[in-house]
UniProtKB/Swiss-Prot annotation:
Disulfide bonds: none annotated. This is Apolipoprotein C-I, acidic form. It holds the Pfam family ApoC-I. The gene is APOC1A. It comes from the Eukaryota. Belongs to the apolipoprotein C1 family. One of its GO terms (cellular component) is high-density lipoprotein particle. Residues 1-26 form the signal peptide. It is found in: Secreted. Keywords: Lipid transport, Secreted, Signal, Transport. GO terms for biological process: lipid transport; lipoprotein metabolic process; negative regulation of cholesterol transport; negative regulation of lipid catabolic process; negative regulation of very-low-density lipoprotein particle clearance; triglyceride metabolic process; very-low-density lipoprotein particle clearance. The lineage of its organism: Eukaryota, Metazoa, Chordata, Craniata, Vertebrata.
Length: 74
């Protein structure tokens, strides 16, 4: 159930990251394009780490492991 909820959240976060700056934010000083890529990479890394932590802290892996143990343990 939580996986069904976390996938739409991931899609929304990725769409927010990829849509670019809003007009209120203005244009960034693009003196070095690698700085922009580095900032994007760090933001993406933080979002992915948060998503992975959310999955590992959920009950789904434990329930799945218990289910497989119950089914194949017989």
């Amino acid at each position: 159930m939580r996986l069904f909820l976390s996938l739409p959240v991931l899609v929304v976060v990725l769409s927010m990251v990829l849509e670019g700056p809003t007009p209120a934010q203005g244009v960034l000083d693009v003196s070095n394009p690698f700085d922009v890529l580095e900032e994007f990479g760090k933001t993406l890394e933080d979002n992915v780490r948060e998503f992975i932590n959310l999955i590992t802290q959920s009950e789904l892996p434990a329930k799945t492991r218990d289910w497989f143990s119950e089914i194949f343990g017989k």
